[in-house]
């Protein structure tokens, strides 16, 4: 499959490889975990920058919360409130091929959402930093799963 893909696309891939070879290793690998959805659009998918590369998943599954607070999943389809939109000049946007619309969307999964994914939606984190909270949630086991396992184990005869 890979050889056939290269043969069919080597013209533009060769140029693209030259373009990205100066990037960080973690940005050179692109993982498309969207079986059955080959539209190439990431705007309606969950995006996560990981040490191993950029991972894209359907929003029907959350990527694993990671011990590293810098790998928080991104929700690109969420429209930002106007006061949260970065203030870039037209020249800066043009330099990167972006429009005002492009920068009006996308935010990280919130601490509250991450806690809910682990079954800890009501948990209070005191005055821990967001990074420490994400790290703790990434190291946690889902509370609902623990309850199911505990019930099975305690009722075993």
Q: Where in the sequence are the language-model features?
A:
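C-terminal target-recognition/interaction regions appended to catalytic cores
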Residues: 1-157
């Amino acid at each position: 499959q890979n050889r056939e893909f290269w043969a069919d696309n080597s013209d533009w891939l060769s140029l693209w490889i030259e373009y990205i070879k100066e990037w960080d290793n973690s940005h050179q690998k692109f993982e498309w975990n969207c079986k059955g959805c080959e539209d190439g659009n990431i705007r309606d998918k969950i995006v996560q920058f990981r040490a191993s590369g950029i991972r894209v998943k359907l929003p029907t599954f959350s990527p694993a919360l990671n011990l590293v607070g810098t790998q928080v999943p991104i929700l690109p389809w969420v429209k930002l409130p106007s006061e949260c939109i970065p203030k870039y000049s037209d020249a800066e946007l043009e330099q990167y091929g972006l429009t005002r619309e492009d920068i009006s969307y996308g935010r990280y999964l919130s601490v509250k959402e991450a806690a809910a994914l682990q079954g800890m939606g009501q948990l209070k984190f005191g005055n821990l930093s967001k990074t420490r909270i994400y790290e703790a949630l990434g190291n946690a086991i889902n509370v609902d799963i623990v309850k199911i396992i505990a019930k099975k184990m305690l009722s075993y005869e």
